[in-house]
């Protein structure tokens, strides 16, 4: 993955994957967004996931793109923690965060230089409890980037979505992502 991006969803590789799904990807200095057609209309929606906090210059550029691409709106989901008052400081830019984000509000980085004991101490009690349950059932976490492991992932995803009754992307979507993003 491109190490210069703020988040994997802002990487060149992610943009290439999204282009392969049929979306228009617009890359600008410091961010990339996707343009989604609204069926049976001339309109589109822009989507900017996991970007840096928007600046005044970025908002001006987004407005230009929005007009050119006939966007009815551009959904912003910056990869930043909320401020102490629980709000992002975007009102002064004339924008607001999405009411219904598609992804987690922000991604955090876990410092793996800490001891296991210190890491566990910093976790929520429920997280520690779930780890102990997994250990009790001999759950192993391994890194396996083989095609066989990917097929197992697809099988587990299908079983989980059926059992838990939630939506996940299609098998073809996951295969396209895998083939685009996996290391050769």
Segments predicted by a language model, with ranges:
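A conserved beta-strand-loop-helix scaffold within acyl/acetyltransferase catalytic domains
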Residues: 1-42, 80-81, 92-103, 107-184
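Acyl-donor binding region in acyl/amide transferases
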Residues: 40-86, 92-103
């Amino acid at each position: 993955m491109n190490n210069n991006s703020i988040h994997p969803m802002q990487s060149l590789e992610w943009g290439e994957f999204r282009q392969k799904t049929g979306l228009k990807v617009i890359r600008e200095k410091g961010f990339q967004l996707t343009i989604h057609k609204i069926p049976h209309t001339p309109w589109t929606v822009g989507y900017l996931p996991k970007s840096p906090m928007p600046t005044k210059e970025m908002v001006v550029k987004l407005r230009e793109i929005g007009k050119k691409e006939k966007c009815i709106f551009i959904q912003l989901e910056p990869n930043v923690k909320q401020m102490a008052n629980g709000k992002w400081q975007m009102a002064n830019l004339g924008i607001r965060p999405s009411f219904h984000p598609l992804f987690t509000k922000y991604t955090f980085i876990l410092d793996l230089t800490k001891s296991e004991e210190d890491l566990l101490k910093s976790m929520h009690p429920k997280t520690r409890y779930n780890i102990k349950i997994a250990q009790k059932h001999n759950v192993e976490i391994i890194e396996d980037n083989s095609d066989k492991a990917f097929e197992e992932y697809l099988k587990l995803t299908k079983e989980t979505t059926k059992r838990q009754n939630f939506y996940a992307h299609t098998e073809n979507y996951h295969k396209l992502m895998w083939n685009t993003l996996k290391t050769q």
